[in-house]
Swiss-Prot record:
CDD domains: ASKHA_NBD_TsaD_bac
Gene Ontology MF terms in the entry: iron ion binding; N(6)-L-threonylcarbamoyladenine synthase activity
InterPro entries: ATPase_NBD, Gcp-like_dom, KAE1/TsaD, Peptidase_M22_CS, TsaD
Residue positions binding Fe cation: H111, H115, D300
EC code: 2.3.1.234
Pfam families hit by this protein: TsaD
Chain ranges passing through the membrane: none
Originating gene: tsaD
Protein name as annotated: tRNA N6-adenosine threonylcarbamoyltransferase
Cofactor descriptive note: Binds 1 Fe(2+) ion per subunit.
Keywords noted in UniProt: Acyltransferase, Cytoplasm, Iron, Metal-binding, Transferase, tRNA processing
């Protein structure tokens, strides 16, 4: 089976061709970072319009790069949610329309399931069951995964997600958009142990996250300290260490609660070097193993949507003719495969 994958949930247009036997044959990605930079964040209307401009040329490019004709395709997979409704509808309209005109089955894919399954695109794939830490700009959650579609959310963010906290803190520090990667780069030159920031919600039982208070703590620290490059770097490092420690503590609890020895980390924040190192150290202590996608598949992309969608097409979970987007869509409501 060979499918076309379409991702348009936020500010990246991702297209991919995935074959069940040959693997990933082609993927193209267009990022709108420059478009939104002047606004300090994603402007939904601008994002939707840019998806409209880019999606068809990118589909043509992916088909060409994969040496794939329309008649070679067995289905179309597009992100149905969660995400920005306008952006979602661009991908849904194009994906469902192409499927109808080409007489192909279609499936709407859960964006976070795409992230969760992104490590399956690598040479070394995690076996079920495992615990997944999904960390992105819009989501932070720990999920017990017993199979595709067999998900139990163990904990999630009750306010700011980890990626959102990175971006907002970067903005407080005067860093340009996108702030998260810039803050991590600044933190690399920071000195350890200059500041001690709280590890939110680690002093009580449970697996939920909360990063809004940490962001406020950082804001107060910035206001009270000198405004020089080294001080900013030290604050950035202390913030990053606080987030990484918090995520690591929660992951340990989730692994102990489930008894699992495999940890998957995915989503945009999973590209963070300090987080990867911290979780690798944790899993070594626990006698387990951590899995994550390569850098290009940590951010939103069409490859993960193509892979996740193919699994559901094989299970016969097809989309009807209606074009739908779901800006909110609980992960644990998905059907098992």
């Amino acid at each position: 089976m060979r499918v076309l994958g379409i991702e348009t949930s936020c500010d990246e247009t991702g297209i991919a061709i995935y074959d069940e036997e040959k693997g990933l044959m082609a993927h193209t990605l267009y990022s709108q970072v420059k478009l939104h930079a002047d606004y300090g964040g994603v402007v939904p209307e601008l994002a939707s319009r840019d998806h409209v401009r880019k999606i068809i040329p990118l589909i043509r490019e992916a088909l060409k790069n994969a040496d794939t004709r329309i008649e070679d395709l067995d289905g179309i997979c597009y992100t149905k949610g969660p995400g920005l409704i306008g952006a979602l509808l661009v991908g849904a309209c194009v994906g469902r329309s192409l499927a109808f005109s080409w007489n192909l089955p279609a499936v709407g894919v859960h964006h976070m399931e795409g992230h969760l399954l992104a490590p399956m695109l690598e040479d070394e794939v995690p076996e079920f069951p495992f615990v997944a830490l999904l960390v992105s700009g819009g989501h932070s959650m720990l999920v017990k995964v017993d199979g595709i579609g067999q998900y139990e959310v163990l904990g999630e963010s009750i306010d700011d997600a980890a990626g959102e906290a990175f971006d907002k803190t970067a903005k407080l520090m005067g860093l340009d958009y996108p702030g998260g990667p810039r803050l991590a780069k600044l933190a690399a030159s920071g000195q350890p142990a200059n500041y001690k920031f709280p590890r939110p919600m680690t002093d009580r039982p449970g697996l939920d996250f909360s990063f809004s208070g940490l962001k406020t703590f950082v804001a107060n620290t910035i206001a009270a300290e000198p405004d020089d490059e080294q001080t900013r770097a030290n604050i950035a490092r202390a913030f990053e260490e606080a987030v990484v420690d918090t995520l690591s503590i929660k992951c340990r609890r989730a692994l102990e609660q489930t008894g699992y020895k495999r940890l998957v980390i995915a989503g945009g924040v999973s590209a963070n070097v300090r987080l990867r190192a911290g979780l690798a150290e944790l899993m070594e202590k626990l006698g387990g193993k951590v899995y994550y996608p390569r850098g290009e598949f940590c951010t939103d992309n069409g490859a993960m949507i193509a892979y996740a969608g193919l699994q559901r097409l094989k299970a016969g979970q097809l989309e009807d003719l209606a074009v739908k987007g779901q800006p909110r869509w609980p992960l644990d409501t998905l059907l098992p495969v």
